[in-house]
Amino acid sequence: MSYPQGYLYQPSASLALYSCPAYSTTVISGPRTDELGRSPSGSAFSPYAGSTAFTASSAGFSSPLQYSGDPAAAFTSYVGSPYDHSAGMAGSLEYHPYAAPLGIYAYGDPAYRKNASRDATATLKAWLNEHRKNPYPTKGEKIMLAIITKMTLTQVSTWFANARRRLKKENKMTWTPRNRSEDEDDDENIDLEKNEEDDPSKLEENGNQDGDAGDQKRSPDGVDFVRLEGEVHLGKELDQTRNNSELNELDERNGHLSNSSSPPTPPLCPPDQSPQAQEDQNLHGHTHQSIQQLLHHSNQPHPLDLVNRNTSVQHGPVTNNATSVIHSPPASTSKPKLWSLAEIATSSDKVKERSNAAEVAGTTAAKSMVVSASSPSRSPSAQCHFPNNTVLSRPLYYSIPFYPGYTNYGTFSHLHSHHGPSSSVNSTYHFNGINQPVLNKAEGLAKECKHISQSQDDLNKGTPYEMKKGMSSI
């Protein structure tokens, strides 16, 4: 509302400022009272203390500007008409500066009073008496009442909420209460004049729909849901008992294995071995497993057990003097899962599919050297047989069909080396499509590799002693 700084005087008039008293911003902007033109200290604005700057020219100062009683009249020649606010200053102070842009909708106007007047309260009471059956004004009605009563929307909503609460305490309710507050209803349903709860026809329709839904729940296509729910609960209880029984069986099985392995185990090979058998044992570099390894394999499920869980593969004798030490465990009886009614209905089909898949896997495994022996570090010698042993089971890759097809690893075992005098009987035996010369050559290579590995082991055993000896000499 003040004049802009720095653009008040032209250069021709600036020469006369040396003889004029200094002007402050309060003097330039126009005094509101008579005291604004007077200097507070006297010496800052006029050469004499207590003198006024614009009432008369001071003695000893000649100024080309003629001062009058109106302070703003001296600047009329230099300031254009758009900047002349002398006529509008008085009117600008009459209204609140923040209420004008909002117009007639006084949203958040600080000029409005906090409490409602008597006229506003009378208007709101009249509307409430007319709508006693549904005292929930819509958004449009609230805006209209706020305009009439010169209140805000928040004040109108609060007044109606308090009025409904007061009538409810006085037991003067003539309407059906709502589950949600009217503010949420107004925000979500702005154009909703009538609520569904107030319309009896819609209430009847909703009741019919609820009744139909209940009938459908009782008998959909003639099936009783209560009976099915009871079966589901029974199935869950049976499932829990089945899980407990399986856990008990696992514990008993582990305890039986630990008890069977707790007494001192007899030597894997009989002491009265022939020199030929001992030489073969030295050739294949076999080391027997300890009790800890037996326990380790007994406690952990083996991959071969997982393959042969649902079926038992019939292993036939491969050679005359060698028998497979691997015998699959008996097939476990498949129990139907009671997770749901659909699982019960389809459990028989799943059992059939599972058994068929297991039979196919078993036949393919039998065709591709399932009965081949394990690695030298995991299998006993050819003279030691454990027909009922499930602990010394082979790794999974010895029984997978594709592995012998690539490497024929199973034919390199010591079980097919034909020890003793009966080796000449089976000299022309063909195993897995490989001739006997090929087998002999492969066995020779395997023996050479084992001799090399044994010599390396001996060297490795001797090196620590030599190192210690060399260090002591140093």
UniProtKB/Swiss-Prot annotation:
One of its GO terms (cellular component) is cytoplasm. Residues 109-171 bind DNA. Residues 174-222, 252-294, 453-474 are annotated as: Disordered. InterPro entries: HD (IPR001356), Homeobox_CS (IPR017970), Homeodomain-like_sf (IPR009057), Iroquois_homeo (IPR003893), KN_HD (IPR008422). It holds the Pfam family Homeobox_KN. It is found in: Nucleus. GO terms for biological process: brain development; cell development; dorsal/ventral pattern formation; embryonic cranial skeleton morphogenesis; gonad development; neuron differentiation; proximal/distal pattern formation; regulation of transcription by RNA polymerase II. It comes from the Eukaryota. Residues 182-199 have a biased composition (Acidic residues). Induction: By hoxb4 and hoxb5. Down-regulated by hoxb9. Its main location: nucleus. PANTHER family: IROQUOIS-CLASS HOMEODOMAIN PROTEIN IRX (PTHR11211), IROQUOIS-CLASS HOMEODOMAIN PROTEIN IRX-5 (PTHR11211:SF17). Belongs to the TALE/IRO homeobox family. This is Iroquois-class homeodomain protein irx-5. It comes from Xenopus laevis. The lineage of its organism: Eukaryota, Metazoa, Chordata, Craniata, Vertebrata. The gene is irx5.
